[in-house]
UniProtKB/Swiss-Prot annotation:
Subcellular location: Cell projection, Cilium membrane
Positions annotated with a glycan in the UniProt record: 195, 200, 222
UniProt organism field: Gallus gallus (Chicken)
PANTHER family documented for this protein: CHST5 PROTEIN, TRANSMEMBRANE PROTEIN 231
Protein name: Transmembrane protein 231
A Pfam family reported for this protein in Swiss-Prot or TrEMBL: TM231
A GO cellular-component term linked to this record: ciliary membrane
């Protein structure tokens, strides 16, 4: 009896033998190819086989750096503004337009999880009775860190701007410091690309403090934060000797962070997809294989059922 055992199935109680180059062996090979290759094509062609991006949620570790730049517009003219910042070089450039405000800030950890949840910021700008504020531009600088996947450290800002035709007494803003991603973060490692100051406080040049240039350089970054309050509240009717007040609440919400999955995560998802489709093919082609051999579609030598001997019987047979 030539050949090797090609197929057996517990339900059939028969073994089928044939030569390695027989039609049955070729059919078996073809069935194997049809079982294992198409699931790969199906998984691949149905998109999302290789995981390109993934997401997770994390509340960032945000701290106000006690750095800010403030410009209050007092009229329509080009030089009618008052300004102050925490950068001495900027303040030196302002000369008589420099006006030091009174600041109070408080960061609050509302749920006691060790991460700050919001910043209460209040700025009181003393004004002469003849001065009026018609616009506010404010940059607050934060240190912003993510730890769950890659360690991402950056200095970022909240920019608040409001103009009104009516002189104001107070500007009230309340919003989120939202993460804005133009690029996926890494899944591991340390990323300090943007751990650079938003405002170059050591520069003596006025152009480095031009809001237009600061915003342009900041927006060039692939990862930024934006302050989301699109509708701050402008209050009018300031008393003659009262300061102009900026009152802002800046929240640090939990963010959905998009990242580039690592090698093993990519392989895992590809494997899960492949195997789940493969199971269906294994079942279907298992049936086909059984049919082909049971019905002798290709010539094979069926070997009659070898009934398992009971241990007692086999023991007795070996007795001398
Ligand atoms: C980020 O920058 C700050 C200030 O320049 C520095 O103190 C800190 O060590 C830097 N962090 C990392 C991880 O490089
Ligand atoms: C800040 O400005 C100074 C002077 O122009 C320059 O030498 C320095 O490289 C700048 N720093 C950054 C971080 O751009
Ligand atoms: C920003 O993202 C673009 C496109 O994803 C990339 O080509 C560029 O290198 C990134 N810039 C930095 C500084 O990482």
């Amino acid at each position: 009896m030539a050949g090797v055992e090609l197929f057996s199935h517990p339900a059939l109680h028969t073994r089928y033998r044939a030569g390695l180059c027989s039609a049955a062996a070729l059919a078996l090979l073809l069935i194997a190819v049809l079982t294992y290759v198409p699931p790969l094509l199906v998984a691949y062609r149905s998109h999302g086989f290789w995981l390109k991006q993934s997401a997770y949620r994390e509340q960032p570790t945000v701290r106000f750096r006690y750095e800010l730049l403030f410009v209050a517009t007092t009229g329509p003219g080009p030089g009618s503004f008052l300004a102050w910042s925490t950068f001495p070089a900027f303040n030196r450039l302002q000369e008589d337009r420099l006006r030091v405000p009174l600041l109070s800030t408080r960061e609050e950890d509302k749920n006691q999880d060790g991460k700050m949840d919001q910043l209460h910021f209040k700025l009181e700008l003393p004004l002469q009775p003849t001065e009026h504020v018609v616009g506010v531009q404010l940059i607050l600088i934060f240190s912003y860190q993510l730890y769950r996947m890659s360690t991402f450290v950056m200095q970022s800002m909240a920019f608040l701007q409001f103009f009104s035709p009516v002189p104001g007494s107070q500007l009230y803003a309340n919003g989120d410091l939202k993460l804005n991603q133009r690029q996926l973060l890494n899944h591991c490692g340390l990323d300090t690309r943007y751990n650079v100051s938003v405002v170059n406080g050591t520069s003596p040049f006025a152009s480095d403090y031009d809001l237009k240039n600061i915003i342009a350089a900041y927006r060039d970054r692939n990862v930024t934060t934006v302050f989301s309050d699109s509708n701050p509240i402008w209050m009018t009717g300031r008393g003659a000797n009262t300061p102009f007040i900026v009152n802002a609440t800046i929240r640090y919400p939990v963010e959905v962070i998009l990242y580039q999955p690592g090698f093993w995560e990519t392989i895992k998802f590809a494997w899960i997809q492949y195997v789940s489709i493969l199971l269906i093919f294994l079942w279907v082609f298992g049936r086909i294989k059984m049919f082909v051999f049971q019905n002798q579609v290709f010539a094979t030598t069926p070997v009659s059922p070898v009934l398992p001997l009971s241990p007692v019987l086999s023991y007795k047979q070996h007795q001398p």
